[in-house]
């Protein structure tokens, strides 16, 4: 099933496309949070800290793969908007073949580097072995991560945001059930959570592939469909690499911040791990709203409809800000209650609640930055998204280190460092955005 987003009323079109993406990420975040909740409740503080300190590295690998898929998806959206279905087929086939080879090699590399990477993060010796085992199991399943993200990106590029949601719902239920079985029943600890995550991703990937084979005529998966276009690969890699590096840059900044957190004690580590899971409920849906904007803009860019690109941006920003406002209310007033879902220790709950109350007041900033980045991806200017992300991380990490190590601030130092990075990001992105809105000049024009 595909959807042409170059015609029709923009506001309802974008809202309908966005809702399944947001719901899908909420389900994904739910089963990610289930790892922390179940480990925290049934294993203990050290296991929760091990899972939490592994999460930034795991997310880095996933986001890098997702960035490659997102870059390919932008090209597919543009070709689909232009009505060139043959080009769509070649793009998807070439990206699938290259991505499979890359993800296998990347998975092996990540497994081999798990221990030195965790040591680089200054993970305490008492939880290092547990964190290594958890991370290696997750990294072993990166091939499934690639296939799901790639197939979902292709479906989104063709205007279908609903199908991946249904598969993710099934995967979420399987993951939570697997967590309970492996951790509570079999007492496999954090390794059980990691195994449950890999198995649920594999099932989600399989469901997506079956659906596309039988329900998406433009992508008739099979031997005849497989085509590898070397020239086209260069363009796919160009877009995918810029998008992947942008995603990876953001996560590397988070990893550097995690290294600072790891010097603040196990209680702060556990609180930050739990609060970060909750915090993801703000950031990830904001990113998905931006992905919806990207799809709409890329299709209309391919069709040469500049006015629809502009209106799609304005509508997307409004949706971003409304969502941010709702999350601010929930996280500010419900901070302690939410933290109790993740931890039993009073100190962990109190530290996490302080983090959530402060960061929730800043959710409007990533709403703006994500929306603007979705805009630039949609018009094909991925260099701006990469540079602004690098600028943000270059500001966030030193400011966090300064506040913690020099001014001896506690967990509140982290939200303030985030805000500093977001402000600089906006300062860089807003001028070229305004120039486009005034002149309507797209990339390479």
For every predicted segment, state its role.
Residues 5-42, 56-71, 75, 100-107, ...:
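N-terminal transmembrane alpha-helices
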Residues 26, 30-49, 118-125, 181-190, ...:
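Helix-terminus/linker motif at the lipid-water interface of multi-pass membrane proteins
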Residues 1-18, 76-141, 185-241, 297-362, ...:
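Short alpha-helical transmembrane segments in multi-pass integral membrane proteins
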Residues 25-29, 63, 103, 107, ...:
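Residue-level hotspots within the lipid-embedded alpha helices of multi-pass solute transporters
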Residues 28, 32-39, 62-69, 73, ...:
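Alpha-helical transmembrane segments and their lipid-water interface positions
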